[in-house]
């Protein structure tokens, strides 16, 4: 696999993290550099490490993991998205809002959006590719798109000033559904 194809793979893998970063930016009231950096680091690191884990796992466990990876991603994203929608429909005083900066939430989102990167790593294990270059490129592109996505999402959240948390929840459920459908079609 050449550098151009690895770059396209990296962009494709980063799209889910970018979409979640947009949703996070909608929700964050007072955006600061360090908040966007935290989100981007979570997504960038997970997207960069998961292909390495997949590559190391190799063909031995590929079939076993492939049978349920899409379900894991769907359940995590649907649960988080559903929670966002539920909380957006509650009174702010009665309900602590969904916090995309919470470490546990970011961990779950990073895992859910990087399942496809794990699968990509499994695929890369059968190709002649520099896994370190691929992981570095995937992490860098995901980090960059996620960082920018937080600010873009925040800008649109400020302009519309509506319950965009619902849109964020729908986005997460949509991403989870896409991953599930793709996984079911492939298997």
Curated annotation (Swiss-Prot):
It holds the Pfam family Mntp. GO terms for molecular function: manganese ion transmembrane transporter activity. It is found in: Cell inner membrane. Signal peptide: none annotated. GO terms for cellular component: plasma membrane. The chain crosses the membrane at residues 8-28, 39-59, 65-85, 106-126, 131-151, 166-186. Keywords: Cell inner membrane, Cell membrane, Ion transport, Manganese, Membrane, Transmembrane, Transmembrane helix, Transport. InterPro entries: Mntp/YtaF, Put_MntP. Its main location: membrane. The keyword Ion transport applies. It is a multi-pass membrane protein. Belongs to the MntP (TC 9.B.29) family. Probably functions as a manganese efflux pump. This is Putative manganese efflux pump MntP. It comes from Rippkaea orientalis (strain PCC 8801 / RF-1) (Cyanothece sp. (strain PCC 8801)).
């Amino acid at each position: 696999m050449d550098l151009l194809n690895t770059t396209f793979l990296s962009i494709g893998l980063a799209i889910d993290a970018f979409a979640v970063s947009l949703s996070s930016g909608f929700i964050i009231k007072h955006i600061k550099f360090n908040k966007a950096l935290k989100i981007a680091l979570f997504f960038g690191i997970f997207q960069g490490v998961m292909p390495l884990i997949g590559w190391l796992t190799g063909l031995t466990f590929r079939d076993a993991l492939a049978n349920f990876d899409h379900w894991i991603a769907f359940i995590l994203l649907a649960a988080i998205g559903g929670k966002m929608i539920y909380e957006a429909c509650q009174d702010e005083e009665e309900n602590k809002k969904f916090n995309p900066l919470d470490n546990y939430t970011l961990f779950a989102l990073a895992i859910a959006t990087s399942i496809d990167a794990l699968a990509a790593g499994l695929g890369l294990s059968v190709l002649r590719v520099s896994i370190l270059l691929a992981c570095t490129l995937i992490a860098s592109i995901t980090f960059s798109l996620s960082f920018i996505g937080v600010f873009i999402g925040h800008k649109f959240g400020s302009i519309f000033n509506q319950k965009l948390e619902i849109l964020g929840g729908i986005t997460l459920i949509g991403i989870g559904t896409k991953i599930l459908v793709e996984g079911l079609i492939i298997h």
